[in-house]
């Protein structure tokens, strides 16, 4: 399963671990993904989404129906 937020599209980033001696080794910064179920009143069913905490805040701000319609236009669901 890809580590991508379904709402915001956030993906892992690549960076460096930097030691005290300034030695650099590659690492990945992973998004804070959560699996959440949302009850959709208009469809009378549960929707499961894999999203970041930023995606949860977008749903809190805009509502689940607006986010789902946006996902459907993008072809995510």
From Swiss-Prot:
It comes from the Bacteria. The keyword Ribosomal protein applies. InterPro entries: Ribosomal_bL28, Ribosomal_bL28/bL31-like_sf, Ribosomal_bL28_bact-type, Ribosomal_bL28_sf. This is Large ribosomal subunit protein bL28. GO terms for molecular function: structural constituent of ribosome. Keywords: Ribonucleoprotein, Ribosomal protein. GO terms for biological process: translation. Pfam families: Ribosomal_L28. Belongs to the bacterial ribosomal protein bL28 family. The keyword Methyltransferase does not apply. PANTHER family: 39S RIBOSOMAL PROTEIN L28, MITOCHONDRIAL, LARGE RIBOSOMAL SUBUNIT PROTEIN BL28M. GO terms for cellular component: cytosolic large ribosomal subunit.
